[in-house]
Swiss-Prot record:
Cofactor stoichiometry and binding remark: Binds 1 divalent metal cation per subunit.
Gene3D superfamilies in alphabetical order: Survival protein SurE-like phosphatase/nucleotidase (3.40.1210.10)
Lineage summary: Bacteria, Pseudomonadati, Pseudomonadota, Gammaproteobacteria, Vibrionales
Protein name (database record): 5'-nucleotidase SurE
Record-stated family: Belongs to the SurE nucleotidase family.
C-alpha cells in the first residue's frame, strides 16, 4: 500500500498587503511542497511593527479558499489566523514576506513583516521573516525561502529564535552564498519634511532612514552588499541580561543614602 506523505502546512503573512507581488510569488513557489494559507492586511501596513488593533473590530474578507485579508496590522493577521482561522489545525511554520525592501539593522524594530513572524513565535511556532533588498527579483527570494523550508523538512527549526532573512535583489544564480549575521545599525533618521496640504494646513512627512552607522563585516548590511543572503537569528526577550548587575548596583546607591 502506498504511504501518503502529509504536506507541510505554512501560514504566510506580510505588511505590504494581501495582493502584493512578494507574498503571492512566495505562495506560488512554496505550493509544490506545502499547503499554503495566506492571511495578510487588506492594504499596505509597512512600519506597523508589533501593533495590535484594540479599539475597533477586525474585518476579515475571504478572497479565495485559502486567502483572507484583514483590515488590521500584520500582527492582527497572525493573531487571527492562529487563534481563530487555523486554531484547530495549526500550521507547521510561519513565513512573513516576501517584504518589498530590506529589513536590516534597527529597521527590524519597525517592520511589520518581522512583527508578523514574531507573533507566530510568541504563539509557539517556528517563524521566518524574509525580505528582498529591492523590488525586482522576488523569484530569487522565493527560491531562498524554498531552500530554507526544505532544510526545515530535514531538520525542523526550533521555536527559540525568529530568522530574519534578507536576500540581495539579483538573479538566484548571482547569489554569492549565505551567511549568518548580526544586526547592523543606522544613525538616527533624517529630519522631518515640512509641507502644506491642499487646504493650506501644515503637514509633516517622516524623513528617509538614517545612514548606516554599523555596517562592518559580520553585519547584515555588509553581507547583502556582497551579494550574499543574510540570516539573522532574532530573540524576542529584550532583557539586557549583562546589565542586570550594573543596574542593581546603581539602584543600591540611592537606597544607601
Amino acid at each position: 500500500m502506498e504511504t501518503r506523505v502529509k504536506k507541510l502546512r505554512i501560514l504566510l503573512s506580510n505588511d505590504d498587503g494581501v495582493f502584493a507581488e512578494g507574498i503571492n510569488t512566495l505562495a506560488r513557489v512554496l505550493a509544490d511542497i506545502a499547503d499554503i494559507t495566506i492571511v495578510a492586511p487588506d492594504r499596505n501596513r509597512s512600519g506597523a511593527s508589533n501593533s495590535l488593533t484594540l479599539e475597533s473590530p477586525l474585518r476579515v474578507r475571504q478572497i479565495d479558499e485559502h486567502i483572507h485579508s484583514v483590515q488590521g496590522t500584520p500582527t492582527d493577521c497572525v493573531h487571527f489566523a492562529l487563534n481563530e482561522l487555523m486554531k484547530d489545525n495549526l500550521p507547521d511554520l510561519i513565513i512573513a514576506g516576501i517584504n518589498h525592501g530590506a529589513n536590516l539593522g534597527d529597521d527590524t524594530l519597525y517592520s511589520g513583516t518581522v512583527a508578523a513572524a514574531t507573533e507566530g513565535h510568541f504563539l509557539g511556532l517556528p517563524a521566518i521573516a524574509i525580505s528582498l533588498v529591492g523590488r525586482e527579483h522576488f523569484d530569487t527570494a522565493a527560491q531562498v525561502a524554498l531552500k530554507i523550508v526544505k532544510n526545515h523538512l530535514v531538520s525542523p527549526l526550533t521555536t527559540q529564535k525568529v530568522l530574519n532573512v534578507n536576500v540581495p535583489d539579483c538573479e538566484y544564480e548571482q547569489l554569492m552564498g549565505w551567511e549568518v549575521t548580526r544586526l547592523g545599525a543606522r544613525h538616527h533618521a533624517e529630519s522631518m519634511i515640512k509641507d502644506t496640504d491642499p487646504r493650506g494646513e501644515t503637514i509633516y512627512w517622516l524623513g528617509p532612514p538614517g545612514k548606516k552607522q554599523d555596517a562592518g563585516e559580520g553585519t547584515d548590511f555588509f553581507v547583502v552588499k556582497q551579494h550574499r543572503v543574510s540570516i539573522t537569528p532574532l530573540q524576542v526577550d529584550l532583557t539586557a541580561h549583562d546589565s542586570l548587575g550594573m543596574i542593581t548596583d546603581w539602584l543600591s546607591l540611592e537606597s544607601s543614602k
